[in-house]
A protein has these predicted regions:
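Active-site-proximal loop->helix
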Residues: 133, 148-161
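Short, well-structured alpha-helical segments in soluble
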Residues: 97-108, 127-130
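Glycine-rich phosphate/diphosphate-binding loop of Rossmann-like nucleotide-binding domains
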Residues: 51-76, 81
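Structural motif
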Residues: 37-38, 90-101
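Short beta-strand elements in bilobed, periplasmic/extracellular small-molecule ligand-binding domains
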Residues: 76-89, 162-170
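A charged, well-structured terminal subsegment
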Residues: 167-209
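N-terminal amphipathic/basic leader segments beginning at the initiator methionine
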Residues: 2-42
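Short Gly/Thr/Asp-enriched flexible loops that form oxyanion-binding sites at enzyme active sites
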Residues: 120-132
Length: 209
């Protein structure tokens, strides 16, 4: 559509806005990083002999089956250590103070697992850090290797990037007892270190940032 523009007469004035009066606020498209509060890990026992280690099932598919193999490893290789498998009293999305209180009262350390999906791996990592930093229980989390970066991000943002963890192959769900035993008795696919060597070191060796 054509526009008709009137030509200003010689004695007319044209008002032009002062560009200096207009201010624009520009925000970074990267956003603002969240504040991270550094947390302190629990003190480690010199020995686990005669002590109780809790194996915490976070109620993901077949997690408890892998923890049974961890319990079997202790019975075979460290019979002086007592173990107890407990399942969360609620779903992994919620904190479980009742279970944590029991572990703090009766346990020397905890092994939490298994993080083997994009939502349960963060859940396992969070529960492990809760036990470490709020209840003073040395804790190692077990995850599958596909979620190592997710776990690293969660622990960093939670203020304990050095939180101890060990990895087993993916998947855990649907595997036989023999296959899960091979996971536990085998090597961490990311580090090449035996899984249970990492676990024992994780609950008995002081953490360093």
């Amino acid at each position: 559509m054509n526009k008709i523009v009137n030509t200003p007469s010689p004695d007319s004035t044209v008002s032009i806005a002062d560009a200096t009066e207009e201010k624009i606020t520009v925000l970074s498209p990267l956003g603002f990083p969240p504040k991270v509060s550094k947390k302190t890990a629990a003190a480690r026992p010199e020995s686990l002999d005669g002590k109780m280690v809790y194996l915490v099932d976070c109620r993901f598919d077949d997690s408890i089956e892998l923890l049974k193999q961890v319990q079997g490893w202790f019975a075979e290789h460290m019979p002086a250590v007592k173990t107890k498998i407990v399942s969360l009293s609620t779903t992994y999305q919620h904190d479980d103070p009742k279970t944590w209180d029991e572990i703090k009262a009766n346990g020397a350390a905890a092994i939490v697992g298994v993080g083997h999906c994009s939502t349960c791996a963060p859940g396992v990592a969070t529960h492990a850090i809760t036990l470490e930093t709020r209840y003073g229980v040395p804790t190692v989390a077990i995850h599958t290797d596909k979620f190592d970066r997710v776990v690293a991000s969660v622990t960093k943002m939670a203020g304990l990037p050095e939180a101890r963890r060990a990895f087993v192959p993916q998947p855990v769900m649907g595997k036989s007892a023999a296959e899960l035993k091979a996971y536990v008795y085998g090597k961490d696919p990311l580090t090449g270190v035996p899984v249970m060597q990492e676990v024992i070191a994780g609950i008995t060796t002081a953490l360093s940032a």
